[in-house]
Each structure stands twice: as structure tokens, then as C-alpha cells.
Amino acid sequence: MKKLFEKVDQYIAKLLGVEDPALKSTQKTMKHTTMGFANVTANQGKFLQVLARSVQAKKILELGTLGGYSTIWIARALPLDGQLITLELEQVNADIARKNIIKAGLDPMVDIRVGKAIDLLPILEAEDAGPFDFIFIDADKPPYAEYFEWALKLSRPGTIIVADNVIRDGKVLDKSSKDEKVQGVQRFNKMLAENKQVTATIIQTVGSKDHDGMAIAVVNQATTLPIKGSL
């Protein structure tokens, strides 16, 4: 028997997270990636697309391509002259993603870079690829804090930064956790809370992907005043 949150997830997906043939085809190919169906859900993909549209993003950076499912959702927020750069560790995943992105008709605006994100980010800085209007972090968890620091370097005031999987099924509550992934997001969450360059929050996500969360941050304007009671 399906749980209530699963039924609600499906209800929302049928209303607002409808997959077209390209997304359905991409979803089927995820089983061939190195992480299986670890991609975002349709509802989460639509949520990311809405956020990217809200800032009228023309330049988007994604850390963690996998099979290109989230890439397609987010890239569809771009204007025709927009660009999305996505970083993927595994060549096999990048190859799958490239085929899916071509099928979706987004190949001209999507640039897939293969390698360790922590090595590719300095290259983007050297290329003066930024600033990006929207940044989505969904890569390996241990260096999430470092990814966030790089996201800030490659952003501008008003940039939205989103990081996925920051609750880890509630395991972030365990301060003595020895899990490197949990420790990575714990470091990230603490850094997010303490950083004065952004206004941020974390939203719990409950649905077909069970219990997790997304961090959402907006890079502050230089003149942004602290919210009363936040000091």
C-alpha cells in the first residue's frame, strides 16, 4: 500500500510535473548510469526549472549530470541564447546524458564537462565562464562545502544556489556519524547557516525519493541589510 506522501507526490506530478517523451526516455536510461535512478523526481525537476526561470537565468551551472534528467528540466528554463554547463565525473554517465540531451533538442545550449568537479571548477573560473545566474549542486557529498565556496566565486548578487540531498534521510541529526556523505552535508549545512553572503533555507522533501531535503540560497546584494532578529 502506498504511503500518503507517495500519493500526493504522484498527484502533483500528474498536474504540474508532466514528463514529455524526451524526459520519459531519459528516465528509462537512468538504469544504465553508475548510480541508477538517483536523479531528481519530476516534481523536483519542475521546481528547479521554476527557480531558474524566476531569475531569468541565461547562464546555469550544474554539478552532477548523471543521465541528464535534471539537466533537461533546468535547461528548459533558458532562453534560446542561454547556456548550461554541467560537470560529470563518469564518462559513461556523460555519454548517456549527451544522447538524452540531443534527443531533447538542447544540445546547442548544454556543455558537458567530464572530470572531478573540484578540478573543473577552477578551470571555469580561469575561463571566466561565470557569473552564473543559477547553480545546482547534486554531486558527491563529502566536498559539498567546497562546492558551495566555488559556487559563491562563480555567482553574482541575485544568483540562486540549490544543493540536493542535504538531509540524508534524517541522518544529519547524528552528530557522531562516521558516514562521509553525512559529514559532508553537515559541514555544508553549517557553512550555509553561518555565511553572510547568502540568504538561505533548507526545505525537507518527502515523496517517491523518501526523506531528504534541498538547500536554497540567494546571493545577497552588497547593500542587503540583516533581517531583524537574525543577529
Segments predicted by a language model, with ranges:
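A short alpha-helical cap/connector motif
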Residues: 1-136, 141-162, 166-231
